[in-house]
Structures are given as C-alpha cells and as structure tokens.
C-alpha cells in the first residue's frame, strides 16, 4: 500500500465521524466548502477547482469531456491516463524513459506534443519511478501546449511527499492557463484512500465545467468533504509525516542497495527496485510480503518491482524478506530483463535529443 503509513490525520477522522450524523442529506453538488478550503491552501481562485471521487475519477471524466484524439504519456507511468483516453477513442503516444538516464523525463518530451487534439500527462513525481520532473521540462511542455492549443495535465498526487512540494507545484500556473491543469488527491499523503477524494485545478473554465458535467451529480460524499477540509487544516500532521517518510525512504533505499539491488532514487513514498530474478516477488509473497510487480508497465519487466516506504518495523521486515529471497536457491528467470515495452502500432519517432523516442500504441483492444 503506497499510502501514508500513519493513516489519515486524527482531525480528518474526527471530522468524518461527525459528518456521519448528516448522511441523511444529499451532499453539495459542487463541494463548495472543500473548494474554498482548497483555494486557500493552494492560493488559487475557487472557480479554477473541480472536485471528484479521487484522481482516477477525474482522469476518466476529463477523457469523457475532452475526447482527445491523441495523448502523450511517459513510459513507464500511471496506466490510468492511457486506459481512460483510449476508451474514448484516443491514440496513445508513449515516450519511453531510459534507465541509463535514471528514468528522468528529457526536455524532448515537449516535442512529442503536436496539436490541438493532444493531451499530455506528466506524473510528478512519476509513478512507478518516484522521480521528480525537472521544472524546466514541465515549463517546456506547458509552453508547447500553449503554442499548439493542446492540454498539459500534471499529476501531483505524490508531490506532497517531496520536501519542496509547494515550490515545485504548478497549481498557480494552471489556475491562470487554458492549457495547463494540475491533478491531485487526498489518497496518498493524506491517507484517505477509502474515501475517494480528488481535485483538478485549471484556468480553463470550459474544461472545469466539462469535467463537472461528465461525472455523476454528487461525486463527493459529505463525509469525504468534511475529512478533506480537516486534513487540509492539519498542516503540522502533513509536515511531520513528510519528514518521517523522508528518513524512512533513505533508510530503506540504503538497506536494499546494500543487498546488491538496484534502487532508483525517489522523492515519493515508494521505491522502484531492479531484482536479479523474476521470481523475487513470489519469494517475498511466500514470506507474507507483497510488492507491486512492474511487468504491466511499459519498458519495465518482471525483474522490476515497486515497494512502499512504510514504518521502520515494516521496512525492516521488507529488507529482511528481500535478504532471504536473494539467498534462496533455485532462482528461476535469471538473466537480463526485456525492456522493449508494448506492441507498436506505428514506427518509433526519434526524440529531439536522441535519448528518447515516442511510440504510438493502441490500448483499445
């Protein structure tokens, strides 16, 4: 579970419990109290915010509202962008990231954005790599979208775990732009995965209204709204959580690296780990430890897995399980991983700097 191991703020839990006494009434269609709280927290106008039942809900509603002809995504990245867009007929253009370059997004990503029918997604930090996107890369992509009449969506669901999250957020830019949007949720940092609460910020009034109309009439429950408002107010809890997880992330990364595993440096609450055998996740599972296998991500394989940064006790157990798994005899699937990615439905398009290329894939099957 790559959510805050400390769980939600006690104030958020108390607010949710109190709101249960009002569940006989319909919630506010537009979650105006939450919108006001988000506007204060993010420093953006209220009319630049639309709320939904989690980030995934908004991703699907955006796809339904915009109906893009084509989307541009990094590979690997969160699969929901492509799944939602392809469901509504979009062609998916993948931009492969290189392990040799630390899975960082190169500046040439912007050049894969072509025209008004495009929606480009940047996950910052990226899932599953945990790598932050260089602000200059985001700026180049935003400028390209503004020039081409396209839309850039920056997913900041994991950004709260970064030490300089506020400085790195592009929420302020999105709030005054027709071609940039920021997506975030209360799932990860706030530990509220079960309540389903997310939001999008953009200065594009047509986009905001389209997303609102594309979903159900009451996407946010009164309980989720109350918990979200209280969570935003508990700034100290979030700050303390961020500091603790930063220390645990460094500790776990060191422990896994000392076992000979390749660990991608991360600014999120998870680590991407390269293992020497395909069956390492199975050996971990046999010890009661579950990790996310990454063969479903483009350009990754079964040799890669994503592990959550949790409490010291849980992290120590994970490190010990890895140690035992690596010592186990009879490993299957040894060898170099195949990182060629998914099937291509058109030729590869060379990246501008020669390091990356965009590949068009059809995920509608």
Segments predicted by a language model, with ranges:
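N-terminal "arm"/small-domain region of PLP-dependent enzymes with the aminotransferase-like
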Residues: 1-26, 40, 116
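PLP-dependent aminotransferase class I/II
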Residues: 10-12, 30, 179-264
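Short loop-beta-helix segment that forms the pyridoxal 5′-phosphate
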Residues: 27, 39-61, 74
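Short acidic capping loops at alpha-helix termini that bridge into adjacent secondary structure
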Residues: 45-49, 70, 156, 178-179
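PLP-dependent enzyme catalytic core of the Aspartate aminotransferase-like
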Residues: 286-287, 296-365
């Amino acid at each position: 579970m790559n959510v805050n191991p400390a769980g939600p703020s006690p104030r958020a839990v108390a607010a949710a419990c109190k709101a249960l006494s009002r569940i006989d009434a319909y919630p506010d269609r537009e979650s105006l109290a939450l919108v006001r709280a988000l506007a204060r927290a993010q420093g953006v106008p209220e009319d630049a915010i639309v709320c939904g039942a989690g980030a995934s809900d908004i991703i699907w509603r955006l796809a339904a509202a915009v109906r893009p002809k084509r989307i541009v995504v990094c590979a690997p990245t969160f699969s929901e962008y492509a799944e939602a867009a392809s469901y509504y007929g979009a062609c998916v253009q993948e931009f492969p990231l290189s392990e040799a370059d630390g899975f960082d997004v190169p500046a040439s990503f912007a050049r894969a954005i072509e025209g008004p029918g495009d929606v480009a997604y940047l996950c910052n930090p990226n899932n599953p790599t945990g790598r932050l996107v260089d602000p200059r890369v985001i700026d180049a992509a935003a400028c390209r979208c503004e020039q081409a009449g396209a839309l850039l969506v920056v997913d900041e669901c994991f950004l709260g775990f970064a030490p300089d999250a506020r400085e790195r957020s592009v929420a302020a830019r999105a709030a005054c732009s027709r071609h940039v949007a920021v997506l975030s949720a209360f799932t990860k940092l706030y530990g509220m995965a079960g309540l389903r609460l997310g939001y999008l910020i953009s200065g594009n009034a047509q986009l905001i209204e389209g997303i609102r109309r594309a979903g159900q009439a009451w996407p946010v429950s009164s309980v989720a709204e109350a918990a979200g408002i209280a969570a935003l107010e508990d700034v100290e809890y979030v700050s303390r959580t961020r500091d603790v997880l930063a220390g645990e992330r460094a500790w776990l990364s060191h422990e896994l690296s000392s076992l000979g595993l390749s660990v991608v440096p991360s600014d999120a609450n998870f680590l991407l780990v390269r293992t020497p055998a395909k069956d390492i996740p199975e050996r971990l599972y046999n010890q009661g430890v579950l990790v996310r296998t990454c063969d479903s991500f483009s350009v990754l394989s079964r040799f890669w897995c994503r592990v959550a940064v949790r409490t010291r006790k849980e992290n120590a157990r994970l490190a010990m399980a890895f140690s035992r798994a690596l010592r186990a005899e009879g490993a299957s699937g040894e060898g170099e991983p195949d990182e060629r990615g998914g099937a291509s439905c058109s030729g590869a398009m060379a990246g501008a700097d020669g390091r990356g290329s965009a590949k068009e894939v059809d995920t509608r099957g």
